[in-house]
């Protein structure tokens, strides 16, 4: 599955489409995907000369020059190249790690933001570090991969091969596995406050999240931003619980919300947009 979104130079999304096409590291996949992109452009009547470029966000750490995925265990896309897409498209193309794109969206929406730790609470956990109003990449592009912080050496096996990573406790997939039901069913039942079992699962989730936040803030003294799929489900009570266990007041902020006027998927294009407005 992949999403296509068209945005302007202000970061506003005009059209978006979701297409069911499972990833496969084959020429046929890249051709089908780029054909869908061309069709999207044609159906929305975008003149070629008005299209400044195409940005591709993927689960996977990219090389420093953003030309190749150097670590992609979730999608099994290690080795995927920007060229796999760009050779089929007559536009400038840009490849980006999806977690870094999410952090860029926070910078775009909050130009006053100097530093932050971003938690991307999606199906798979992600994260990013913002320092000096820039996304910190690290020497090997691994900076901000908080999902692989070990919170329990004897914990569940993570897809990275290690045990007890934060991914195995605080991703949406981990929450569904522990609760035994989809997220969309879990939260309405949780808020009814009639199930001690569900409350226990959620408390365990929040405890692990607060533990990670506290430790990260010992290294990066900056606000915490909660974003991603699970973020809209957090209540004020949940935030206060995190603050109490985090032991640093006024440091947790909600990230981009779906009703904020800018489509969250617009984040994938913002690094490319910046190239044209600077």
Predicted segment positions?
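Hydrophobic "anchor" residues
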Residues: 13, 68-69, 135-136
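Acidic/histidine-enriched, beta-strand-rich ligand/metal-binding domains
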Residues: 234-237, 241-258, 262-278
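Adenine-nucleotide phosphate-binding core of ATP-dependent small-molecule kinases
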Residues: 28-47, 168-169, 174-236, 254-262
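Conserved hydrophobic/aromatic positions in well-ordered beta-strands
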Residues: 5-7, 128
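Glycine-rich phosphate-binding loop and adjoining helix at the ATP-binding site
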Residues: 16-42, 49-115, 236-247
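Glycine/GP-enriched mid-protein hinge/lid loop-to-helix segment characteristic of carbohydrate kinases
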Residues: 16-18, 25-26, 83, 90-196
């Amino acid at each position: 599955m992949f999403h296509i979104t068209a945005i302007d130079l202000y970061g506003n999304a005009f059209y978006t489409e979701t297409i069911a096409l499972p990833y496969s590291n084959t020429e046929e996949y890249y051709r089908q995907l780029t054909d869908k992109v061309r069709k999207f452009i044609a159906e929305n009547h975008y003149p070629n000369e008005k299209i400044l470029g195409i940005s591709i966000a993927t689960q996977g750490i990219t090389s420093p020059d953003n030309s190749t995925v150097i670590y992609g265990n979730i999608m099994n896309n290690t080795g995927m190249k920007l060229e796999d897409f760009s050779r089929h498209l007559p536009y400038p193309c840009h490849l980006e790690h999806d977690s870094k794109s999410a952090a860029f969206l926070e910078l775009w929406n909050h130009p006053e933001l100097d530093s932050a730790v971003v938690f991307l609470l999606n199906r798979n956990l992600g994260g990013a570090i913002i320092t000096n109003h820039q996304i910190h990449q690290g020497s090997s592009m691994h900076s901000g991969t908080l999902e692989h912080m070990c919170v329990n050496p004897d914990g569940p096996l993570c897809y990275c091969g290690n045990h007890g990573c934060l991914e195995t406790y605080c991703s949406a997939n981990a929450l569904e596995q522990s609760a035994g039901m989809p997220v969309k069913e879990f939260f309405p039942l949780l808020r009814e406050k009639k199930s001690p079992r569900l409350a226990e699962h959620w408390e365990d989730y929040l405890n692990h999240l607060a533990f990670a936040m506290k430790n990260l803030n010992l290294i990066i003294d900056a606000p915490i931003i909660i974003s991603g799929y699970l973020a809209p489900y957090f209540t004020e009570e949940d935030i206060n619980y995190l603050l109490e266990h985090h032991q640093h007041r006024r440091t947790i902020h909600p990230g981009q919300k779906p009703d904020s006027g800018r489509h969250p998927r617009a984040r994938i294009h913002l690094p490319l947009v910046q190239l044209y407005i600077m």
